[in-house]
């Protein structure tokens, strides 16, 4: 039996490099940590290899059946892991490759666009919400976080593997493409000319929701490209919501309208 690899092994150090955005982009690979994410990636044939401590390999033996497993020592696992209490399993996975052209070719009915979102936790939650509400894709536009950042992958709870995710640096160009493809683009802003209640009747149609960054929302220049600027009506002592909360409200309203339209 081969001894577990140490933290100095080239196989381990090469995988650790995937914690960096540039390395992930160059390799087209990302790290999935923990049994739930690895099981979801394995179901889709994305797993290249799984690093496991000896105890984790025993505990999760049925999950690892049929996968390429590399045993590592505890110090190597600490390096590979990005969590406080490592579960003892980290997989190198192939990134799904999908383009905006491919998304639009499918005539999507609901799309979420995240512009300049830098917080990986919010980004992952947005992906999970989009999956739950039946969105056809999530587009990370502008200067946004890498959706395959470890925290984002974990926050998505595996949804990043089931809903198509596209990165596009030019937000205005993305909006123009969405509109040209027949989607109505609604931008969430604090100074919208319409409330979410006002547009409820329009939401059964093909819609792209545009959400801005956590701290300052959408820039006026970007919001101007949308078909409508929409504000979420709020009472109490609250004048803004974080991007995940705003997305949950808007995407649910769209999903509800689409269901009602299908039933009607």
Positions of PLM-derived features:
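Short, ordered loop/turn segments at secondary-structure junctions
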Residues: 55, 142-145, 215
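Structured adenosyl-cofactor binding patch, chiefly the S-adenosyl-L-methionine
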Residues: 91, 129-133, 147-160, 220-264
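RNA substrate-binding interface of SAM-dependent RNA methyltransferases
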Residues: 36, 97-98, 103-192
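Structural motif
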Residues: 52-56, 94, 116
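N-terminal positively charged helical leader segments and presequences
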Residues: 1-84
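Short, hydrophobic beta-strand segments that form beta-sheet elements in well-ordered domains
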Residues: 30-32, 49-54, 184-189, 209-212
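Active-site/ligand-binding-proximal alpha/beta "capping" segment
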Residues: 186-238
């Amino acid at each position: 039996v081969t001894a577990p690899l140490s933290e100095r092994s080239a196989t381990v150090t090469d995988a650790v490099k995937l914690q960096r955005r540039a390395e992930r982009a160059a390799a087209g690979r990302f790290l999935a940590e923990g049994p739930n994410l690895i099981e979801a990636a394995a179901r889709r044939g994305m797993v290249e290899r799984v690093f496991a401590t000896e105890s984790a390999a025993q505990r999760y033996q049925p999950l690892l059946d049929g996968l390429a497993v590399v045993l590592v020592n505890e110090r190597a696992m600490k390096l590979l892991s990005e969590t406080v209490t490592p579960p003892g399993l980290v997989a190198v996975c192939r990134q799904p490759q999908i383009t905006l052209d491919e998304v639009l070719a499918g005539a999507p009915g609901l799309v979420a666009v995240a512009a300049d979102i830098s917080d990986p936790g919010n980004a992952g939650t947005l992906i999970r919400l989009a999956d739950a509400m039946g969105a056809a894709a999530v587009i990370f536009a502008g200067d946004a976080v890498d959706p395959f950042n470890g925290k984002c992958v974990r926050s998505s709870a595996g949804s990043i593997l089931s809903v198509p995710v596209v990165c596009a640096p030019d937000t205005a160009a993305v909006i123009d493409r969405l509109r040209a493809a027949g989607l109505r683009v609604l931008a969430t802003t604090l100074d919208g000319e319409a409330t979410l209640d006002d547009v409820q009747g329009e939401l059964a149609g093909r819609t792209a929701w545009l959400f801005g960054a956590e701290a300052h929302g959408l820039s006026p220049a970007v919001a101007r490209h949308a078909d409508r600027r929409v504000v979420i009506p709020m009472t109490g002592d609250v004048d803004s919501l974080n991007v995940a909360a705003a997305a949950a409200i808007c995407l649910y309203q769209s999903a509800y309208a689409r269901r009602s339209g299908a039933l009607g």
